Amino acid sequence: MNTPLHHIKNRTKILPPLRVGIGGPVGSGKTTLLEMLCKGMRERYDLVAITNDIYTKEDQRLLTESGALPADRIMGVETGGCPHTAIREDASINLEAIDRMLVDFPDADIVFIESGGDNLAATFSPELSDLTIYVIDVAAGEKIPRKGGPGITKSDLFVINKTDLAPYVGASLDVMAADTTRMRTTVKGLKPFVMTNLKTLSGVQEVMAFIESKGMLRSGDAATLRDGR
């Protein structure tokens, strides 16, 4: 049985769903961010989620047990290899998962795709994701933003998570913000970044607002036109 989101009525689909990729190293908070996004946006949008793990479906289990979405709206994918391959070089396993999910939920507004934990070079194929969010955590070290890599420099939104841990690991949030600003400034301006503490929901509203704005979404009864779609 496919679980509807009953509070969303009379929806008129205009476009395919927005596909939002969430990447980052192991333990950075990708699954927790996805949980918070689902809980914060499910009253306005029809959501489904795809999670990636190498050998298990642990993230699918965690999302299901947290009540982020009904169980049948969360699909776990076992990549069985290097995580970035399944989101970049050969995204077919995830593209197939999206197709299968949309057969069951054709009115979905947003498909979240969470990658398996990977390094700073991981990026989503444009065939798989319309928007990319890359998550790091403060505990990994103050130096991470200035190391660069596609996740830091090219993602549509860069998230620096676990800001509450900064005093305990000797990290300066001001330094991390300055380094991030330098690494994400292009000829077109500064690409956005957000600092979050998901334990207190700090920064979550900013992430949701970014998805709505950049993804050209509108709460209510209909999806609207989006850039390039």
UniProtKB/Swiss-Prot annotation:
This is Urease accessory protein UreG. Belongs to the SIMIBI class G3E GTPase family. UreG subfamily. One of its GO terms (biological process) is urea catabolic process. One of its GO terms (cellular component) is cytoplasm. PANTHER family: UREASE ACCESSORY PROTEIN G (PTHR31715:SF0). It comes from the Bacteria. GTP binds at G24, P25, V26, G27, S28, G29, K30, T31. Its main location: cytoplasm. It comes from Albidiferax ferrireducens (strain ATCC BAA-621 / DSM 15236 / T118). It is found in: Cytoplasm. Homodimer. UreD, UreF and UreG form a complex that acts as a GTP-hydrolysis-dependent molecular chaperone, activating the urease apoprotein by helping to assemble the nickel containing metallocenter of UreC. The UreE protein probably delivers the nickel. InterPro entries: CobW/HypB/UreG_nucleotide-bd, P-loop_NTPase, UreG. The gene is ureG. GO terms for molecular function: GTP binding; GTPase activity; nickel cation binding. Facilitates the functional incorporation of the urease nickel metallocenter. This process requires GTP hydrolysis, probably effectuated by UreG. Keywords: Chaperone, Cytoplasm, GTP-binding, Nickel insertion, Nucleotide-binding.
